[in-house]
Amino acid sequence: MTSTTPPKLNALEILDLRSSPPAFTTPSKRINEGSDVARFLTSLAYRDIGVFILQLNRALCPRNQSSSPLPRTFPLNSKPATTPSVQTLQALLAKIGSFIDEAPPDPGPRRFGNVSFRKWHAIFEERLSELLDEGLLGETLKVGDGKAKEEVSLYLLGGFGSVQRLDYGTGHELSFVAFLGCLWKLGFFKDGEQGGEIEREIVLKIIEPYLNVVRKLILTYTLEPAGSHGVWGLDDHSFMPYIFGSAQLTRPINENEPMPLEGSVKGAPKPSDVTKAVVVEDQRQVNMYFSAIGFINDVKKGPFWEHSPILFDISGIRDGWGKINKGMIKMFNAEVLSKFPVVQHFPFGSLFSWDVDPDATTPTQSVHMVNQPAMAAPTPSGPGTSAPWAQATRMPPSGPGIPYSRMPPPGPNSGSLARPPRNTSGTGSTDAQITVTKAPWARDS
């Protein structure tokens, strides 16, 4: 007889601020050279960010309904947010985006980035304290005699690009996710129904609007990709929409089930539809994955397989969006959380701690771990440097995640940049090829 006991589903802890408040502190840099990445992968900060991302990811998975043969899905254009905490952050993002009107792009010639981004960032930084004092946000951040506000503000400030390098990348994106994680720990989202509903609002009604603000910044100030692999990276700027967008399209589950490892919800677009402009334009209104693809189409010209070969390869996966979602999480762990250039600026405080996770396993000396720069290249100090610090948490085994599974159109396919051969087993496997660490929340189930 099959057990009906629901599996334990991890969620980020909400702190008891009355009886056991944390000793808030100004977050500081701890990752100074490549060898520090292995230590980061055993930290409480790494664990907590991973738990939070997987918690949000599962909330987006379609659900079976006892009252209907049709599953419940969670599109971007679902009903407007009604939770006060979510509405507060939507208003915050709207104000941050409005600062663009006060810092129009410089019309002069430039090679990289528009210097007016520095003016925009200065306005943002100048008004940051005031923004965090307003309404529900201000009430939450009063804890610790204002020290919580000081700690949390660094993560929000780090979420909108580098004022020195005039760039934006996955580290900045994760800085914003960490800001949300801080608020979760402080109980800011307790006014919503936890265990699915409030998590969905966080992704669809906060993270997607955040991405829209960032995309406007990128277009307005021609921000460079931060730490980009060029065309051989997944995306020039973001990773979150590919995780959450693939989750939106996975096979439906019951509330007591873990995330599916393969399959798609009925009626979902095919993975290969990312190459069809008409489908992308339609789906970008309802799905985060296609919204990100749509932005790529807005800013890049030429064949999709040529300017986005990794996404093109992924579009050949035959086991559905569940398989892609599983692989995206593994790829995120390998290409963001385990890479020194991305995590080197991650600031550690009381909410995302450098302390060792007692349940962490020792990271394996994999290709990812060995091939780390010895030390960061020197960069100017000052505001805006606290961002390229992708976070993590014992995420699934670190590895490429999604192997090359789709061949490009006929043409040259040799040389140092030739794409790896397609999977010979024909399964489109997304099993990790390189393991960094195996966390309690990362085990396949």
Swiss-Prot record:
Region labeled Disordered — which residues? 374-445
Do the record's keywords include Isomerase?
yes
Provide the GO MF annotations for this entry: peptidyl-prolyl cis-trans isomerase activity; protein tyrosine phosphatase activator activity
Q: What is its main location?
A: cytoplasm
List, alphabetically, the GO terms of the cellular component aspect.
cytoplasm; nucleus; protein phosphatase type 2A complex
Residue spans of biased composition, Polar residues class: 422-436
Catalyzed reaction equations:
[protein]-peptidylproline (omega=180) = [protein]-peptidylproline (omega=0)
Q: Where in the cell? A: Cytoplasm; Nucleus
Checking InterPro entries in the record gives: Phstyr_phstse_ac, PTPA_C_lid, PTPA_sf
The protein's UniProt keywords, in alphabetical order, are: Cytoplasm, Isomerase, Nucleus, Rotamase
Q: Which GO terms describe its biological process?
A: mitotic spindle organization
Q: What is its EC number?
A: 5.2.1.8
Cytoplasm as a keyword of this entry, yes or no, is: yes
Function, in words: PPIases accelerate the folding of proteins. It catalyzes the cis-trans isomerization of proline imidic peptide bonds in oligopeptides. Acts as a regulatory subunit for PP2A-like phosphatases modulating their activity or substrate specificity, probably by inducing a conformational change in the catalytic subunit, a direct target of the PPIase. Can reactivate inactive phosphatase PP2A-phosphatase methylesterase complexes (PP2Ai) in presence of ATP and Mg(2+) by dissociating the inactive form from the complex.
The family classification in the record reads: Belongs to the PTPA-type PPIase family.
Protein name stated in the entry? Serine/threonine-protein phosphatase 2A activator 1
In which organism is this protein found?
Gibberella zeae (strain ATCC MYA-4620 / CBS 123657 / FGSC 9075 / NRRL 31084 / PH-1) (Wheat head blight fungus)
Upper taxonomic lineage? Eukaryota, Fungi, Dikarya, Ascomycota, Pezizomycotina
